């Protein structure tokens, strides 16, 4: 695995203690070869009190600055375009960013938002995302795994967070070889909620 994308709410709280953050950072350090690229979402916006500001993070963890931007992972021939939050709600749709003009690069878009018609959490148009020119669109905010449009994926949360989150939880593994890519869901959760 070369890199891991986290589309918001990596910390899911501003209330974490420094000791908890150091434990998370130590786990990240144990990733021998992978880098984590994260954007902030509605539960972990980059504000003055952000938990992200409490410690110095591992070099393996890249938190995209608030706003819209790009990060190039040249060793992987990949450019990631993102929007990272600095507030708890975003009711206005975002002007959809365009892929990088760099030729021969795999183009990824990372957003934290909601494909529901009306939302206080960055309303997104799944079809517009699918037709945006990105090779892969990684979304966060919805905790259930789903693919709302071609090349547009919510992996959901790795673990169910409450009784309303039944079903499989895990992540998407995306393998890229030249022009071909294969996207498969990998179940990961250690616990499961079921309706009886």
Regions from the language model: what does each represent?
Residues 3, 12-162, 168:
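His/Asp/Glu-rich metal-coordinating catalytic cores
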Residues 68-74, 155-196:
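Binuclear metal-dependent phosphoesterase catalytic core
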């Amino acid at each position: 695995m070369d890199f891991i994308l986290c589309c918001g709410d990596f910390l899911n709280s501003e209330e974490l203690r420094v000791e908890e953050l150091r434990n998370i950072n130590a786990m990240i350090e144990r990733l021998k070869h992978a880098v984590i690229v994260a954007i902030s979402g509605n539960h972990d916006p980059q504000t003055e009190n952000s938990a992200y500001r409490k410690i110095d993070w591992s070099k393996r963890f890249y938190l995209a600055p608030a706003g819209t931007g790009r990060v190039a992972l040249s060793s992987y021939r990949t450019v990631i375009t993102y929007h990272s939050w600095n507030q708890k709600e975003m009711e206005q749709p975002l002007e959809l960013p365009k892929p990088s003009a760099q030729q021969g690069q795999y183009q990824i878009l990372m957003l934290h938002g909601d494909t529901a018609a009306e939302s206080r959490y960055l309303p997104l148009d799944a079809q517009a995302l699918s037709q945006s020119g990105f090779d892969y669109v990684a979304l966060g905010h919805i905790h259930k795994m789903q693919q709302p449009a071609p090349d547009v994926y919510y992996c959901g949360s790795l673990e169910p967070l409450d009784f309303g989150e039944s079903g499989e939880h895990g992540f998407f593994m995306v393998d890229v070889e030249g022009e071909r890519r294969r996207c498969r869901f990998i179940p990961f959760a250690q616990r499961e909620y079921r309706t009886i």
